[in-house]
Amino acid sequence: MIASLVSSKEKTSWVTNKVMISYKLDWKKNPSFWNMWAQRSLKQALQLQELNKNVAKNIILFLGDGMGIPTVTAARILKGQLSGQSGEEFQMEMDKFPYVALSKTYNTDAQVPDSAGTATAYLCGVKANEGTLGLSAAAVRSQCNTTQGNEVTSILKWAKDAGKSVGIVTTTRINHATPSAAYAHCADRDWFSDNEMPPEAVDAGCKDIARQLFENIPEIDVIMGGGRKYMFPMDTPDVEYPTEKQHFGTRKDGRNLVREWKERMKEKRAHYVWNKKELLSLNPSKADYILGLFEPSDLPYNLERNKETDPSLTEMVDVALKILKKNPNGFFLLVEGGRIDHGHHDGKAKQALHETVEMDRAIGRAGLLTSTHETLTVVTADHSHVFNFGGYTRRGNNIFGLAPMMSDIDQKPFTSILYGNGPGFKLIDGLRENVSTVDYQQNNYQAQSAVPLRFETHGGEDVAVFSKGPMAHLLHGVQEQNYIPHVMAYAACVGQNHEHCGSSSSSAVSPRPSPATTAISTLAAALTLAWLHC
């Protein structure tokens, strides 16, 4: 029946128009809608039998810090609702990737991991202890003398050594856990500058993370994020907040790492920028290196961002890709939506989910600027959070709204979104707070939690790995987290995997979809649109 409906352009056009005219029909009650939608998905799955085995010229890794599967689902609903839909049926950009795997996130010494040990896994290819960066599990957190000899390198370095351009873009400080594992070897993730290090570690010769950013891999092509204060001598006023002492420079060694970078790069087409105007005024064709430090510490939440002075993650990714893709040898780019994690730790689900939506926009922008023929794109998380939503809510319920029921214990309402622990635990006269008396829709509302903690914790369940492009099919099943960079390296012929590279570049990629498949996709999309207008 499907084939007869879509056997020609004319019939497809006729059916599509008829669907649009009849959009008031309640398609969710019509079995044809679900059958056609499933058939479209089946056709797309059958196309995947022709695997893309090209060598990946480019690799992009999008890392949503703390972006567990419940966060992905809730952000999908939010993004759909922001576009006027009920939300559940919406497709995120990452949802469109053809391959999905699960990643086991534990650290070598932790069932529920931290972001440093996990970053070492998905960037360097080895599991590590919590709190350590770019070191094997033989290193012990905060013990400087366990650093030397236990260093492990990252896929960013493997790509750089292979002649590719490399970049890091993050919404956190550039020396935070996720980006740091790409270039640093540090026994403690909190050694942001020498000011945060114990004197004995400095005396023993261990380097702070900010210093390693510029010394370990001296010519990272693109660096964008926050963390300005860690680059300047102690008590140096910040360029943007010159009267606020909490933003002054922190370095005890007196070094000005930004000035040193500018001096070292003066013969190259290199630019230092610290605000949105400077970033967007750059001509990527005339810039080969960029150091962008947009805040003294982390960048603001996207909901609180000054759109005149602070670049969005999407804007940073856009500029980064336009610079990196000029290299005929290709590039590696790490992009972190880092403040998803911070929103969850603060119990501020609205902030966390809007950060996830913004990262998804950046994924979409990257897709427009690259080709799946030559670019492997991977989207994943380092860990989850004890965040969830439930309560038998109806279709289209505001994701930040109330469940349609009262507690049968205390007879009070509750929000659909809840945390297992965190700062949202509140008692009024010894009883649970009545959420109907507060503004639970405001940006910084802290959702209720079962256990009181100053900061909500990570979760220990597996996280999703979405992939598309060359060799994306290798990211399948349930895998250890450290498997991810091995696949990326294999796809790009960097690091230790070279034996397959001679013939891969001529391998076939997925063919263009057939006219019938295209017609089914068009029809299913039209049915969806009609349904959404019901």
Map each language-model feature to its residues.
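Intrinsic disorder/low-complexity segments
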Residues: 1-5, 413, 507, 518
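Mobile, glycine-rich extracellular loop/lid and propeptide segments
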Residues: 45-46, 51-75, 122, 127-138, ...
